[in-house]
Amino acid sequence: MPKTVAYLGPEGTYTDEACYFYAPDEERIPFSSLGLVTSALEEGKVDEAVVPIENSLGGTVIEVVDYLITSEKAHIKGEILLPIDHCLVTRPGVQLSDITVVKSKQEALTQCREFLSTELRFAEQIPTTSTASAVTDLKESDDRTAAIGPRRSAELANLPILIQGIQDRQNNVTRFAVLSSNGDTPDNSDKTSIAFDFDRPDGPGLVFGALSPFADRDINLLKIESRPTGKGMGNYIFILDFEGHIDQPHVKEAIAELTKHTATFKVFGSYPRAQGLAGR
């Protein structure tokens, strides 16, 4: 019996593309918001969920991180690195000179600002709820309208791609997390994601003292960032990614040293590190 995997829909979004790459033969279920995706996982309505957690240009997806901090069920069991390759999609036979309206999600319009300002500088830009819906709506539009969206959305809608790769930055990558209620056994390519805050607001050497146990054990830190806890100015929670699995002895030792100074500590998951970009 195939497992059920929730994702942020509709079909044809970049999250759908990541979910399809991860689970092509499983039952993929779209939801209209990240909140509904995480609720479905939390309530046991699905086995897993694929959610965006970080973008190389836009940074961390705060809603997902906040969910992981508070959830007692969800764990990261895998990750997918998906190149964000924006395509200009049209109705059949449409040329660039015909286009007077461009529709897409606001983030996509912003990420294609240079192309739009040079190639379609007189075209009206209309934001939509998703890149996929912008492409799907072309079926009911006239030949003056184009959409910016993923290749997959164009393929699903059976519409031609006029120009591919119109984003300003070619290194635009979104990291997706695969969430589950179950963890995985150690692998040689594991990474671990954790969150913690300190038992006091600040102090000399506080962050250094928290991170030095990792350096002392040659544990490579992959990412560190902070965000407000909501408990008042100067109170932050730290998000840390590092190489290794939470069950490895040297990682356990580093965590034991770290938690001597923390008020809150949460393991998001230990999981295989993505090996390259999806589909490349």
Where are these regions (language model features)?
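Domain-level signature for soluble enzymes in the chorismate/prephenate branch of the shikimate pathway
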Residues: 1-280
